[in-house]
Amino acid sequence: MIRTTFNKLREVKDSLPHGSMDAIAAELNIAADDVRDFFSGASKMDGYHLEAGPDGGIVVLENSAILDVALRLAWAAKNAL
């Protein structure tokens, strides 16, 4: 289980290169809208819990697959791999 803040998720989203939402969706075999919803706080996915708190709220993720792929893509873009 991963705990982070909504603002941290937005930072990850903002660091992703163009087309990443579709790339994440394709890799995980899910809809691109589900990936967009994940980063917008509108996610209805099981295991995504948003609570009031600092930095836009506390997000608890039971499944971090979208975040894991996003962090890998952001790291690769930052390091030009």
Predicted regions located by residue number:
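Short, amphipathic alpha-helical "recognition" segments used to contact nucleic acids or chromatin
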Residues: 2-19
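Short alpha-helical "recognition helix" segments of helix-turn-helix
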Residues: 23-25
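Short Lys/Arg-enriched helix C-cap and helix-to-coil transition segments
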Residues: 46-81
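DNA major-groove recognition helix of helix-turn-helix
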Residues: 39
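Key DNA-contact positions within bacterial/archaeal DNA-binding proteins
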Residues: 33
